[in-house]
Regions:
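Phospho-regulatory, Ser/Thr- and acidic-rich intrinsically disordered linkers and terminal tails
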Residues: 1-317
Length: 317
């Protein structure tokens, strides 16, 4: 009996170690911002697809296949957030007045409520492009976040910038592997209209100074030679090529500092950075900032002003 108990204890210890090796994430991944992207209430097919598109933007640090049921509450997702290292909750809701988008810092807030002024799904954005970027490896790393014009008076602007920046992993410029930067999220704030434009791009690099024919061969693309008498004509007469590629202005040219996986980009030579839109597109307007998680003191409201703020405005006038 004693030997059986010892073997059972050893087996349980081995199982515990195995579970740790399977589920234990590296510390870098644990520290990276994770998110839940969900919807609440009744929404249409278009908005449901937008939820899926936004999850795609937030990959790989999001629950891409998260199932949301009517009986689920915000508390349910908060309870899951701790064990799964989730730091942000993104919620799409629809009502008679329009569509709202909430971003909350877990577990205690703050919460920012945006009005979704306009949006375009990824499939609509991609279908409008002549060249479509289809590469599953694009989503193996988090996107680079670029924010423009998030400056000015008001605590809410700084809160917006901080909230959006903290939704994505920080990048160490001196240690970053350029092969990991495959996507970019661009956010632009217009202080006059108070609107935020959200765009999502794929980033590619191509060698500079090569003819169209040579570039196709270097990048391992199989060229169509049916319209040419020989290979020389293909290489020396680029105007006959059907592909309307062009050399961008020198402002998009950079010197390659690292070895890149993409073909033709050699360290120390110039390459051109190209961006292809992936979608979705969002136009947002900040409506409200709450101190807590979907509740608490209202720190900012676009349409309802506190008495102190009204006094300050009257003094200025």
């Amino acid at each position: 009996m004693g030997s059986k108990r010892k073997s059972t204890v050893k087996k349980n210890k081995r199982l515990k170690k195995l579970k740790k090796t399977v589920y234990e994430e590296p510390e870098e991944l644990k520290r990276a911002p994770h998110s839940f992207v969900i919807h609440r209430g009744q929404i249409g097919k278009s908005l449901l697809q937008l939820v899926k598109d936004f999850r795609k933007v937030m990959e790989p640090f999001t629950a891409a296949s998260l199932q949301v049921y009517k009986k689920n509450t915000i508390k349910d997702f908060v309870a899951l957030a701790g064990p799964m290292h989730v730091s942000h909750l993104c919620v799409f809701t629809s009502s008679d007045t329009g569509v709202n988008f909430r971003v909350a810092r877990l577990p205690q807030g703050p919460t920012m409520t945006f009005k979704l002024v306009n949006y375009a799904l990824s499939k609509d954005v991609v279908s409008s492009l002549r060249k479509q970027m289809v590469n599953p490896k694009l989503f193996s790393h988090a996107p680079l976040i670029v924010m423009n014009n998030f400056t000015g008076e008001g605590l809410h602007i700084n809160l917006m910038a901080t909230m959006f920046q903290n939704m994505f992993p920080t990048i160490n410029v001196t240690k970053v592997n350029l092969n990991d930067i495959k996507r970019c999220v661009l956010m632009n704030y217009n202080p006059e209209t108070k609107l935020i434009e959200f765009r999502h791009y794929a980033i590619t690099t191509v060698p500079v100074g090569l003819s169209k024919g040579v570039k196709k061969i270097v990048q391992s693309k199989v060229p169509d030679l049916s319209n040419f008498d020989d290979i020389d004509e293909f290489l020396l007469k680029p105007e006959l090529l059907s592909d309307s590629e062009f050399e961008e202005t020198t402002s998009s040219h950079v010197v390659v500092p690292q070895k890149l996986v993409s073909r033709g980009n050699i360290v120390g030579t110039q390459s051109s950075i190209r961006m292809s839109e992936l979608g979705p597109r969002l136009t947002l307007q900040l409506i409200k900032v709450e101190e807590g998680l979907m509740t608490g003191d209202v720190m900012f409201h676009e349409f309802i002003k506190k008495p102190d703020e009204k006094k300050d405005e009257s003094k200025e006038n």
